[in-house]
Amino acid sequence: MSEALELLGQDIVARAPGVLGHSVAFGELTIVARAASVIDTLTFLRDDAACRFHQLIDLTGVDYPERAARFDVVYHLLSLVKNHRIRLKVSTDEDTPVPSVTPVFPVADWFEREAFDMYGIFFDGHPDLRRILTDYGFHGHPLRKDFPMTGYVEVRYDDELKRVVYEPVKITEFRAFDFLSPWEGAKYALPGDEKAQ
C-alpha cells in the first residue's frame, strides 16, 4: 500500500500545480503545496483520473507559533473510487489569507469558518466568514497556543440581572486536594488515628 501511495505522491508532485513535495508516513500520503495555488491543487486532485479525490472529509488548522508561517491549513480528502485518503498541507502566517476552497468543495464553508474562529486563519473569497463556535463578541482564538487556558472573560448567568454577564477571569487561589482512598492501604497516620487505638 505504501508503494502505491509513494507512486501516487510522485505523480502528483510531477503534474499538480503548486505542489512543493510529498511524504508517506504510517501509511498516509501527505502533499505540501503553496497556499496561493490551493484551489488549483485541489481541483487537480478532484478531477484528475489518477486521483479522483471527490470528498473533502475535513479541513483544520495547526498552530506552530515558533515559525514565521505560523499556521498549517490541512485538508483531508477521500477517493472512494481509488480507496485512498490524502492530506494536503499549506502554510500561512497571521496576516496572509488562504484562498477559500468553497468553489471546489462547498462543504469547506463551515470547516473554514471553524478554522477562522478557532485559529484566526483568514480565507479569501469565503461567502460568510464569521464566528461559528464562539460568541460574536469573543476576543481571541481559543486553539492558538498563545491563548490563555483560562480565557479572557468568564461568562455566567446572573439571577439578579436575569441575563448573561461577562466578567474578567479571576484566578482563584491554588488548592491541592489530597483525596485518600481507604482501599489503597495507606501506611501513614491521619489526624485522629490516635483516638482509634
Curated annotation (Swiss-Prot):
Example of a GO MF term: NADH:ubiquinone reductase (non-electrogenic) activity
Annotated localization: Cell inner membrane
InterPro entries hit by this protein: NADH_DH_suC (IPR010218), NADH_quin_OxRdtase_su_C/D-like (IPR037232), NADH_UbQ_OxRdtase_30kDa_su (IPR001268), NADH_UbQ_OxRdtase_CS (IPR020396)
Any one Pfam family match given in the protein's UniProt record, by short name: Complex1_30kDa
EC number per UniProt: 7.1.1.-
Record's bilayer topology term: Peripheral membrane protein
Domain of life: Bacteria
Catalytic activity: a quinone + NADH + 5 H(+)(in) = a quinol + NAD(+) + 4 H(+)(out)
Keywords of the record: Cell inner membrane, Cell membrane, Membrane, NAD, Quinone, Translocase, Transport, Ubiquinone
Family annotation (SUPFAM superfamilies): Nqo5-like (SSF143243)
Single GO cellular component term: plasma membrane
Keyword Translocase: yes
Main location: membrane
Function: NDH-1 shuttles electrons from NADH, via FMN and iron-sulfur (Fe-S) centers, to quinones in the respiratory chain. The immediate electron acceptor for the enzyme in this species is believed to be ubiquinone. Couples the redox reaction to proton translocation (for every two electrons transferred, four hydrogen ions are translocated across the cytoplasmic membrane), and thus conserves the redox energy in a proton gradient.
Family per record: Belongs to the complex I 30 kDa subunit family.
Subunit structure: NDH-1 is composed of 14 different subunits. Subunits NuoB, C, D, E, F, and G constitute the peripheral sector of the complex.
Xref: PANTHER family: NADH DEHYDROGENASE [UBIQUINONE] IRON-SULFUR PROTEIN 3, MITOCHONDRIAL, NADH DEHYDROGENASE UBIQUINONE IRON-SULFUR PROTEIN 3
Protein name: NADH-quinone oxidoreductase subunit C
Native source species: Caulobacter vibrioides (strain ATCC 19089 / CIP 103742 / CB 15)
Gene name, Swiss-Prot/TrEMBL: nuoC
